[in-house]
């Protein structure tokens, strides 16, 4: 039986681990990030992958830094035939990558060489792509740069969010891995080098990227809101207060107004001018210190005026 070590951390990784178990591989160990404090009460919380591994009585390693010798030697001591990673969250050292008989392969949520990095799902939507996918490739120490083994495309729907696409890609990754591993073991795959001229990056989202730039087109603002839903959530300011924007709709704007200005107030939301003739009607938001709510609910208690400028003093 093929001995596999799985390395992964978030919810995205869980279906991949589950599929390895269902397909009958001997998952002899799981490597995941350390437990972290979560929420306002800072409750020490295990990763989703750790929770899944413990359901199956699989030993779990949680290195703070996998590149340290005493940590990676614990992985090597398991003597895996194959290592599979999916959103592990740390750069894996060569000592591990070169050890398994069948190598170390990664399940990545984009069509490489596009969108290398830690936030490919967010960027696929924020950039307005109509499709993305899963790539399974050999791991190298350079970020997501290994030779490609298999790929599958996944359509991005008009109202897709990062949350819904995350779920689709997670399942697609598990399914593709199930088809890839047997072919890899049988030596039936021809690895393909990535074209470095086509490389783009999707680095982890920074706080300053979350703010809505109303000078962009309505389409770009709409994609920005979708791409940051449900985390970390796009934001703007209204009357000097931070407001998270959970959802909006593209609407035509007939009169010209400065980008970021409220040009219409309707029962279910207010329309904001952008950098072109497509406005964005905010329909779901979250004022600072309050719960997420519909814009109609918000408007019952707060009455912004037409001409109010959003995005100032953030």
Curated annotation (Swiss-Prot):
Name of the gene: fmt
Positions contributing to (6S)-5,6,7,8-tetrahydrofolate binding: 110-113
Record organism: Bacillus thuringiensis subsp. konkukian (strain 97-27)
Keyword Protein biosynthesis: yes
Signal sequence, start to end: none
Catalytic activity of the protein: L-methionyl-tRNA(fMet) + (6R)-10-formyltetrahydrofolate = N-formyl-L-methionyl-tRNA(fMet) + (6S)-5,6,7,8-tetrahydrofolate + H(+)
Family (UniProt): Belongs to the Fmt family.
Keywords associated with the record: Protein biosynthesis, Transferase
EC category: transferase
SUPFAM superfamilies: FMT C-terminal domain-like, Formyltransferase
GO cellular component, one term: cytosol
GO molecular function, one term: methionyl-tRNA formyltransferase activity
UniProt-recorded name of the protein: Methionyl-tRNA formyltransferase
Assigned EC number: 2.1.2.9
Plastid recorded as keyword: no
Cross-referenced Pfam families: Formyl_trans_C, Formyl_trans_N
Function: Attaches a formyl group to the free amino group of methionyl-tRNA(fMet). The formyl group appears to play a dual role in the initiator identity of N-formylmethionyl-tRNA by promoting its recognition by IF2 and preventing the misappropriation of this tRNA by the elongation apparatus.
CDD domains in alphabetical order: FMT_core_Met-tRNA-FMT_N, Met_tRNA_FMT_C
């Amino acid at each position: 039986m093929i001995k596999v070590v799985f390395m992964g951390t978030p919810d995205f990784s869980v279906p991949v681990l589950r599929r390895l178990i269902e397909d009958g591989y001997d998952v002899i160990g799981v490597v995941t990030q350390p437990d972290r404090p979560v929420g306002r009460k800072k409750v020490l919380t295990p990763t989703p992958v750790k929770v899944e591994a413990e359901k199956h009585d699989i030993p779990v390693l949680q290195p703070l830094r996998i590149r340290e010798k005493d940590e990676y030697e614990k992985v090597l001591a398991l003597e895996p035939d194959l290592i599979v990673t999916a959103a592990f969250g740390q750069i894996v050292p060569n000592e591990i990558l070169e050890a398994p008989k069948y190598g170390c392969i990664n399940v990545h949520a984009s069509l490489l060489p596009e969108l290398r990095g830690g936030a490919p799902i967010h960027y696929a939507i924020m950039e307005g792509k109509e499709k993305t996918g899963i790539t399974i490739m050999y791991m190298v120490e350079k970020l997501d740069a290994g030779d490609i083994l298999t790929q599958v495309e996944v359509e991005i729907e008009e109202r897709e969010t990062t949350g819904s696409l995350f779920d689709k890609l997670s399942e697609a990754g598990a399914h593709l891995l199930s088809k890839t591993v047997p072919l890899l073991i049988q030596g039936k795959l021809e690895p393909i080098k990535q074209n470095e001229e086509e490389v783009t990056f999707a680095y982890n989202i920074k706080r300053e990227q979350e703010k809505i730039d109303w000078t962009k087109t309505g389409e770009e603002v709409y994609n920005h809101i979708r791409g940051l839903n449900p985390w970390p959530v796009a934001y703007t300011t209204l009357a000097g207060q931070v407001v998270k924007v959970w959802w909006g709709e593209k609407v035509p704007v007939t009169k010209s107004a400065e980008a970021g200005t409220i040009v219409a107030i309707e029962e279910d939301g207010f329309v904001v001018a952008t950098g072109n003739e497509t406005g964005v009607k905010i329909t779901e938001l979250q004022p600072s210190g309050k719960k997420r709510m519909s814009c109609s609910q918000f408007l019952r208690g707060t009455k912004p005026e037409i001409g109010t400028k959003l995005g100032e003093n953030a």
